[in-house]
Amino acid sequence: EDAQNIIRELDEALMLEGPRLDEAQIDALKSYHMSPFRTPRLAGKVYPSGPDALEKALDNYCEQFPVQRAISRGVVDRVVGLLSPHIDFRRGHRVYAETWQSIEEAFPQFEQVFLLGTDHSGSAGRVTLTQQNYATPWGVLPNDPDLVNTLIEGLGKKFALGEELHHVNEHSLELAAVWLHYFLRRAKGRTSYKNMPTVIPILCGSMTPYIYGQKKPSQDDNFATLLTTLDDAMKKRRTLIVVAGDLAHVGPAFGDPRTWDETARTALRNADYAS
């Protein structure tokens, strides 16, 4: 009887596979699709929920940490990518501010943005699309349904959308999207600015099989399809690729038993270079 009660409670808590969990997932996906945009989950928690307060916060970050190495005018036309953090703004605001400001001169040119971020719940080797629009307190960042549909057709619906619910709570894309939207809004005043670019959100699961040499991305049909399709799209429109990917999470704040001192930092840095 005790075992039966435990099983029932786990089932009611949606912690067991079965009809109840399947139905809950279907309902959650319907709710996500019916919304006009993906609801920002971290507004009011990691960053201000009001547009004016958010703008003031990011203004302050950028004023406090002006860019150290902005791209030269001769390089503006060749900017294609940016590696952004996705840690909380309290700890990462300096890196966010300096990184995004470094390519500010290029923002008026972009017609589409591929926003790739870590899926902290994603399956190994999985990329997960969504047809939903992302949004920030400033409004909607429009997706490109035609391009997303082309990707879904090439990758297969099960692979491309099987973990779409991860978009609901995943923070990596949301935090980068806030900075993206901030700089796109700043670009509006430039003479070369045209329209708000489309923003295609893509979550990326664990790369463990590739890191440990179990297989190569070039031998993966799904990755080949993804890259070929995105490459074709880039030939038609001026594109920015944003990768929202943190590096090492180290120190007591992330569960390490000791403080991450300069000796340990140097060892990690050397290991990174060696790899």
Report each predicted region and the residues it spans.
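Long, charge-rich, low-complexity alpha-helical segments
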Residues: 1-42
